[in-house]
């Protein structure tokens, strides 16, 4: 209803504006500017209010009206209350603490600063971290504002301290934190004889002088011993905080414990004395540059193979799953990978790894597969012994040996495993579930659990003869 009424008014104002005579434009201009219809024509076609007011500040400001500073009399009253002048008693108290020259400077400063300016323009802090004196910090005062002194950087020729230098540094540190009275020179036997015998050796002293000196010297030693025992009982050594500070903050180099202004610690030298040749280098010269990152160093120690032999192994990723773990932080997605590794000559290994990054998971699974390689029994280096059946969860795998030239009539995952192990004639059949991961696990267990003919012969107490070799005269694989 309101929108239709507003449209009618707008249409009527346009019709009235069209009927106004065009003559005397100078005289009709003021009338048109004050006409309600013209003002209605200039408004926008919406019911929202105009936002022509000044934008409100985001910060709360204390106005002069709220402080009572609306007139000169109130400003004067506020100034006398907040910035009162020194009374005679206060000046006498200041004169008791400051000399006459300082008092003249204080009076000159009071006369130079107008308290009214502080009332109108000043900003007084009320927080607990305010300065004990009033200052706007507009300029640096060399007397009050001291420049930060930068310490000299430590020498770039500094080296690690040896045993003797470290011992001396430890003694110096102990002397720095030693508490109690400073030590003094111990008196000698010569200090207890008359002055005329100072220059003479002890053998030329008279007997009575020597006996009296020995008596006084032993009494002095006993007194010093009792004093040292009493001081040791009252004295306190370094605290746990001092020892921790020495371990963490004390420099172990010959730089006099100087601290640089840089936030970066000084770099270690190329060759540390006393440690040179003892630290482990990630790059082994025997690798011929094949493992500059040190990726296969631990694997070399566990398997006994060289990096060149490790790189010649056949590896294949058989299973790659995307798994999601529900935690209190949400769903964490990661990659689960299964990799096989073999040398193509009767060795096969299986490795599983999981990581947030797929490349890291593949790398970890590959290293585990190489580490877990085990020998696979092969008949004539081409097939397995007899028939093997293995069950893993709901997956049942049946492997059968086949004659020469039969080939690998298996699935693609078992095909890769047989090629890595060096098996060329084999047939496989899945009786139940065909889960990829369980299939690989069951096949690997089946290859490891083959019946060994030598064990069967030993168990039966009979001699084992290979019929094929006898029939063909040994002209077989």
From Swiss-Prot:
Q: Where in the cell is it found?
A: Mitochondrion
Pfam families xrefs: Ribosomal_S5, Ribosomal_S5_C
Q: Which GO terms describe its molecular function?
A: RNA binding; structural constituent of ribosome
Domain of life (superkingdom): Eukaryota
Query: SUPFAM superfamilies this protein is in?
Result: dsRNA-binding domain-like, Ribosomal protein S5 domain 2-like
Q: Does the keyword Mitochondrion apply?
A: yes
InterPro entries per record: Ribosomal_Su5_D2-typ_SF, Ribosomal_uS5, Ribosomal_uS5_C, Ribosomal_uS5_N, Ribsml_uS5_D2-typ_fold_subgr
One of its GO biological process terms is: translation
Q: Keywords, A to Z?
A: Mitochondrion, Ribonucleoprotein, Ribosomal protein
Q: Which GO cellular component does the record give, naming just one?
A: mitochondrial small ribosomal subunit
UniProt family annotation:
Belongs to the universal ribosomal protein uS5 family.
Subunit and interaction comment: Component of the mitochondrial small ribosomal subunit (mt-SSU). Mature N.crassa 74S mitochondrial ribosomes consist of a small (37S) and a large (54S) subunit. The 37S small subunit contains a 16S ribosomal RNA (16S mt-rRNA) and 32 different proteins. The 54S large subunit contains a 23S rRNA (23S mt-rRNA) and 42 different proteins. uS3m, uS4m and uS5m form the narrow entry site of the mRNA channel.
What task does this protein carry out? Component of the mitochondrial ribosome (mitoribosome), a dedicated translation machinery responsible for the synthesis of mitochondrial genome-encoded proteins, including at least some of the essential transmembrane subunits of the mitochondrial respiratory chain. The mitoribosomes are attached to the mitochondrial inner membrane and translation products are cotranslationally integrated into the membrane.
What is the name of this protein?
Answer: Small ribosomal subunit protein uS5m
């Amino acid at each position: 209803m309101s929108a239709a009424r507003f449209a009618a008014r707008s249409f009527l104002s346009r019709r009235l504006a069209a009927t106004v005579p065009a003559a005397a434009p100078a005289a009709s201009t003021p009338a048109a500017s004050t006409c309600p219809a013209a003002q209605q024509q200039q408004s926008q076609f919406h019911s929202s209010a105009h936002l022509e007011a000044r934008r409100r500040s985001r910060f709360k400001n204390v106005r002069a009206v709220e402080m009572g500073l609306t007139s000169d009399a109130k400003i004067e009253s506020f100034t006398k209350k907040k910035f009162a002048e020194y009374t005679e008693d206060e000046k006498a108290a200041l004169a008791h603490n400051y000399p006459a020259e300082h008092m003249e400077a204080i009076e000159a400063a009071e006369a130079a600063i107008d308290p009214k300016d502080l009332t109108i323009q000043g900003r007084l802090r009320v927080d607990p971290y305010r300065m004990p004196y009033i200052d706007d910090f507009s300029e640096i005062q060399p007397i009050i504002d001291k420049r930060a002194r930068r310490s000299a950087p430590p020498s770039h020729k500094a080296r690690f301290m040896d045993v003797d230098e470290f011992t001396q540094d430890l003694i110096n540190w102990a002397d720095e934190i030693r508490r109690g009275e400073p030590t003094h020179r111990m008196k000698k036997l010569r200090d207890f004889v008359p002055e005329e015998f100072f220059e003479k050796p002890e053998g030329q002293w008279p007997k009575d002088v020597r006996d009296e000196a020995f008596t006084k010297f032993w009494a002095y030693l006993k007194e010093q011993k009792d004093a040292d025992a009493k001081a040791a009982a009252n004295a306190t050594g370094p605290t746990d905080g001092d020892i921790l500070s020495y371990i963490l903050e004390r420099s172990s180099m010959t730089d006099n414990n100087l601290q640089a202004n840089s936030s970066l610690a000084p770099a270690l030298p190329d060759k540390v004395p006393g440690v040179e040749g003892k630290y482990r280098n990630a790059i082994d010269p025997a690798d011929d540059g094949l493992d500059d990152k040190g990726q296969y160093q631990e694997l070399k120690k566990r398997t006994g193979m060289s990096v060149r032999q490790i790189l010649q192994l056949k590896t294949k990723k058989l299973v790659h799953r995307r798994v999601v773990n529900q935690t209190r932080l949400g769903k964490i997605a990661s990659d689960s990978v299964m990799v096989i590794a073999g040398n193509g000559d009767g060795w096969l290994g299986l490795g599983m790894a999981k990581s947030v990054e797929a490349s890291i998971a593949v790398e970890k699974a590959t290293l585990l597969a190489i580490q877990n390689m085990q020998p696979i029994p092969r008949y004539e280096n081409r097939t397995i012994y007899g028939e093997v059946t293995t069950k893993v969860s709901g997956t049942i795998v049946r492997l059968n040996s086949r004659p020469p030239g039969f080939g690998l009539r298996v699935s693609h995952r078992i095909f890769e495993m047989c090629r890595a192990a060096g098996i060329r004639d084999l047939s496989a059949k899945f009786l139940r579930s065909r889960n990829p991961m369980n299939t690989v696990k069951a096949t690997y267990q089946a290859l490891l659990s083959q019946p060994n003919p030598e064990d069967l012969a030993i168990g039966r107490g009979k001699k084992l003869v290979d019929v094929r070799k006898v029939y063909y005269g040994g002209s077989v694989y």
